[in-house]
Amino acid sequence: MREIFDLYSYLKISGAQAAGRRLKAREAGIHVPVFLQADISVHCNLSCPGCENGYIHTKHQEELMTVNEWDVLFREAEKLGIRFFFLTGGEPLMEREILERAARYQNSWFLVFTKGTLLNEEYDQFFSDHRNLVPMLCLDACSDINLEKMGKSSYLYESLMYSMDALSRRDIVYGTSVTLTGENRNRVLTRGFLDGLNRRKCNGVLYLVRDEADGHGAGHGGGNPAWDGSLRLTEEEKEEVKENLKELWKDYHDMVLYTLSRSGHFLGQPFEKAEVYRVSAEGNVYNSPAGLEKLGNLREKDLRSILQR
């Protein structure tokens, strides 16, 4: 198989300094997560099941974090030892200025979760010029999740395939994300599914898992009606997912294959103990993507103070 970007190898080789900073911070009573999700956008040109936008409810524009405030967050987080950011929304590509600020932090990786419909020649060049920003194409549009409720499923599928081909032609590092359900897991956790992505030079898949955290997080407010308890995996199904991934790793060792739950936990090695915190569009800092516990607000305290235990 071809050699492509491997997240785990990057962490082992280039993450030593960041790990050292996190350890130093921990000794000072500051609990720094490995990953930080940042809801940089509340706007989106689509409405699809599984979208994080269903968890963001902001009434007024003035409540949102400004470009400069996001810049300050990225800088402080990097100093504390956070090297991996999940830029979510909404549609992050609608916040070009924030992405340009993120691109300045060359020692960090920013995974940009996008539907792909706004990717064009200009954005392809932008990602080519700023290799620390990694497009993550959301494949829920073509993974058999409530397609009858989407309306634009055919358009989204064609757009995603076009975006993959455009990114691969420029040799841009990119990944995909898909929400695992009891209905689709036997299709998206297969060699056939991964072979199709591999042929398009996809560098990895992040499988998102709904769990007990759904419905209990801050800002849920009913969320997206397409999501309900029926889409969550049972504990038995989660164990099967772990075993399937172990087998797939053997054949796709040059692809990044991980699962992440809404409670902020990875299923299986090597990130099983890594934590994912979240910063909402209003600057609230939570201890998980689902927003189970609010730790503070960045307009009242800086990140270091909020993470102080």
Segments from the language model and where they lie:
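Flexible mid-to-C-terminal extensions adjoining Fe-S/redox cofactors in radical SAM and related proteins
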Residues: 19-28, 32, 288-309
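Conserved acidic residues
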Residues: 83, 133, 203
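Short glycine-/acidic-enriched loop or helix-start segments at secondary-structure transitions
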Residues: 96-98, 122-123, 146-147, 217, ...
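Hydrophobic pocket-lining residues within nucleotide cofactor-binding pockets
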Residues: 92, 119, 180, 210, ...
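Conserved alpha-helical substructure of the radical SAM core
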Residues: 2-125, 129-130
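Radical SAM enzyme [4Fe-4S]-AdoMet core and its adjacent flexible, acidic
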Residues: 136-140, 144-274, 278-295
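Helix C-cap/helix->beta junction micro-motif
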Residues: 80, 106, 130-131, 170, ...
